[in-house]
A protein has these predicted regions:
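N-terminal glycine-rich phosphate-binding loop and ensuing alpha1 helix
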Residues: 71-131
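Short phosphate-binding loop-to-helix
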Residues: 139-174
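Short aromatic-hydrophobic micro-motifs that form the base-stacking/packing surface
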Residues: 175-179
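RNase III-family endoribonuclease catalytic core
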Residues: 182, 190, 284-285, 292-404
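Conserved core of the sugar-phosphate nucleotidyltransferase
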Residues: 185-272
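Short, conserved loop-to-beta-strand elements that form functional interface hotspots
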Residues: 389-398, 402-435
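C-terminal edge-of-domain segments
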Residues: 434-449
Length: 449
């Protein structure tokens, strides 16, 4: 057995337009005295996920003085999103908002959720670290966008965004949906439910009931706290613009969210059912959890005939045998199955499309090099291989002596540990074409994140 090529070299090489709903929210309901407005839960389906698509050729405004609502009362009741992306990410240890997460950054995922929830415009409150990402999104957005500098605290960032909205002269009844970009797993349905609640009652705060047993520690004593009626606040938090602006103008102290200031100002917040998935990215453990939620899977299969006069290459290993696999490239069925599994997980075209057998450039191509190109394409989408499991189906030759080398080759090119690659071999007990020694096949499943 010998290595056909250097996997390290290949590892180095691997280094529909969206349709958005019209701006509209539910009509305003009858309002009583602020103190009499009841707090309630408006249930909503949270199964939706932000859709993907191009944003090119759409209008964008990055000047905060531009009329985000067009300055017309004709859009009375429209909503504008505020996307907060000015945090320091000190506990995360890296820039959690711009780093790819399952192919898209947290800013992009939250931005898409606001758009999917039906906002008519978006104001980004940014830091110098996130400004460039916000500018890219704004440049291709299907709604007007503005970018403001974030403050030293979340409260200051929101205040800056509200001031930018005020300068656009929003119409009566306008709603603002304030969202932490770090809550990038929010579903558009939650955004829409919060906006609709704000249109009816003045506010719509995403929240989830406390499900765990709660204790308060005082000194060395633990006292149980009844969890009935307890909720964990999330975002988005949507409000009538006039009311939340009033609440911020009257703020006389710090608050960790907008609903707190809203309540201090004498308003009664309305809760909207959030989701356990809508957690904030704060620690590395939160990031790992989000990656698990966003893991994608693909499968691959390939088969080639055994013929005389060809080398038998499997998993980048040249295996001594009297026959080899027939194909336009080196016919490495194992790597071909792995490549198609990875491409499927990333929703990319298969190897027949990327490396057609009608192209002379791929005649006799080294499949290790092709795998490197596949990994590079996946990384260009902001993803990376996570796990690979493959099975070789062949009557002969014996594969066991070569399995470890195959795993090492695949791991090296994919940039993962050999412990994240499984390769097995099986026979068909003399049945079918594999069993009669006419061909060798392989199947694989892969995950990317």
């Amino acid at each position: 057995m010998r290595q056909r090529t250097d996997p390290a070299a290949h590892a180095a090489a691997a280094g529909a337009r969206r349709e958005w709903p019209d701006c509209a929210i539910a009509g305003s309901g009858e309002r009583g005295a602020l103190a009499e407005r009841p707090t309630h839960i408006a249930a909503t389906d949270t199964d939706g996920t932000p859709s993907e698509g191009a944003r090119a050729d759409n209008r964008a405004v990055t000047d905060t003085e531009s009329g985000m609502f067009g300055g017309s009362g004709e859009q009375d009741g429209c909503a504008i999103g505020v996307l907060l992306c000015a945090g320091s990410a000190a506990r995360m240890g890296f820039d959690k908002l711009t780093r790819p997460l399952g192919g898209r950054s947290a800013i992009e995922r939250s931005f898409d959720a606001l758009l999917g929830g039906g906002v008519a415009g978006i104001v980004f409150a940014v830091s110098e670290t996130t400004r460039q990402a916000a500018e890219r999104l704004a440049a291709g957005a299907p709604v007007p966008c503005a970018i403001v500098q974030g403050g030293a605290t979340r409260q200051e960032s929101v205040k800056n965004a509200l001031e930018a909205i005020r300068r656009t002269n929003p119409p009566d009844g306008a709603v603002v949906a304030i969202h932490d970009a770090a809550r990038c797993m929010v579903a558009p349905e939650i955004v829409r439910a919060c906006i609709e609640s704000a249109g009816r009652t003045g506010s719509g705060i995403a929240a989830v009931p406390v499900a765990d047993t709660v204790f308060r520690q005082e000194g060395g004593a633990l006292t149980p706290v009844p969890r009935e009626g307890l909720f964990r606040m999330q975002t988005p938090q949507a409000f009538r613009f006039s009311e939340i602006r009033d609440a911020y103008a009257r703020a006389d102290g710090a608050a960790t969210d907008d609903a707190t200031l809203y309540r201090r100002a004498g308003y009664s917040p309305t809760l909207v059912m959030g989701s356990a998935d809508n957690e904030k990215l704060t620690t590395p453990a939160d990031w790992a959890r989000a990656e698990r939620m966003l893991t994608r899977y693909g499968t691959g299969f390939d088969t080639h005939r055994l013929v005389e006069g060809r080398k038998l290459i499997l998993g980048g290993v040249d295996i001594p045998f009297e026959r080899g696999l027939l194909g336009h490239s080196d016919a490495d069925v194992l790597l071909h199955a792995v490549m198609d599994a990875l491409l499927g997980a990333a929703a990319l075209p298969d190897i027949g499309h990327l490396f057609p057998d009608s192209d002379p450039a791929y005649a006799g191509a080294d499949s290790m090099a092709l795998l490197g190109q596949v990994v590079q394409r996946i990384r260009e989408k902001g993803m990376r291989p996570l796990h690979i499991d493959a099975t070789i189906i062949a009557q002969r030759p014996k594969m066991a002596p070569h399995i470890d080398a195959m795993r090492g080759n695949i791991a090296a090119v994919c940039g993962i540990s050999v412990h994240q690659v499984g390769v097995k071999a099986t026979t068909t007990e003399g049945m079918n074409d594999e069993g009669r020694g006419l061909c060798i096949s392989a199947q694989a499943i892969a995950s990317v994140v």
